[in-house]
Amino acid sequence: MQTALASRGRVGLVPTMGFLHEGHATLIRRARAECDVVVVSIFVNPMQFGPTEDLATYPRDLDRDLALAGAAGADFVFHPEAAAMYPAGFSTRVEVSGVSEPLDGAARPGHFAGVATVVLKLLNIVQPERAYFGEKDWQQLAVVRRLVADLNLRSEIVGVPTVRADEEAAHAGLALSSRNSYLSPEQQRRATVLSRALRAVQAAYAGGERDTGRLRQAGLDVLASEPELALDYLVVVGPDLRDVPQLSDDPLNRVLIAGRLFGVRLIDNMPLSTAPVPAPA
């Protein structure tokens, strides 16, 4: 891989687990606009799945993925086998403490160690100047940024805003996700309760509310309309996912949600402020 990319200019990496959609295409197009060479990795990483999670059934369609990646501007697709990434005797796991521990870190033990390990391997293999991640996985983005900062890696991590279903769609506002394919059209429509709850929290914040308990309640009031939702968490946090009782006016304030709807685990988040988010130091 490094030999193929040598002397080609600025390299951008878009790491994915495949079953690509418009959210991934947005990442690829962003990389295309900013880099000389764009590499898309497709790897369903077994290390980030728990023993009862959907590794075996995670949606896959390589031919479709190759077509979408190429149409969006990818120059190379890196699609390794698990045995190549984790050969016999592989015994290293990368732990990013602190930011990886709450929320999905608590709900999915070992998940972020798997994420950090595979991201570090991909960054070492591809050696990109920039790597592009969706903000829909906000905690994952925070973990990857901490990993890169702590280990003095050369890659810049670029967060790209979440892509949502069009306003004309019955499921308007639903964050695009490969796991949405598990849901029927009607179930996807009902899954918009997550984004509606987040927008209710946004509205309360815009109205001047800074108490995190009352902000959270604004979202819970919306979620109460969906009896099939098993909520993992709805949290209002400051920078670095800090859970505080009272928010300051920080553009990094965020509301995050995760839960199971019709047996499918969904996550989403939104910024609370409409002010521009500063680039990470």
Curated annotation (Swiss-Prot):
Ligand binding (beta-alanine): 48
Gene3D superfamilies: HUPs, Pantoate-beta-alanine ligase, C-terminal domain
Active site per UniProt: 24
GO molecular function, one term: ATP binding
Residues given in the record as ATP binding sites: 17-24, 134-137, 163, 176-179
Catalytic activity line of the entry: (R)-pantoate + beta-alanine + ATP = (R)-pantothenate + AMP + diphosphate + H(+)
Keywords: ATP-binding, Cytoplasm, Ligase, Nucleotide-binding, Pantothenate biosynthesis
Main location: cytoplasm
InterPro entries named in the record: Cyt_trans-like, Pantoate_ligase, Pantoate_ligase_C, Rossmann-like_a/b/a_fold
Residue numbers binding (R)-pantoate: 48, 140
Subcellular location: Cytoplasm
A cellular-component GO term for this protein: cytosol
GO biological process: pantothenate biosynthetic process
UniProt-listed Enzyme Commission number(s): 6.3.2.1
Transmembrane segment boundaries: none
Superkingdom assignment: Bacteria
Family listed: Belongs to the pantothenate synthetase family.
Misc note: The reaction proceeds by a bi uni uni bi ping pong mechanism.
Subunit structure: Homodimer.
Function comment: Catalyzes the condensation of pantoate with beta-alanine in an ATP-dependent reaction via a pantoyl-adenylate intermediate.
Protein name: Pantothenate synthetase
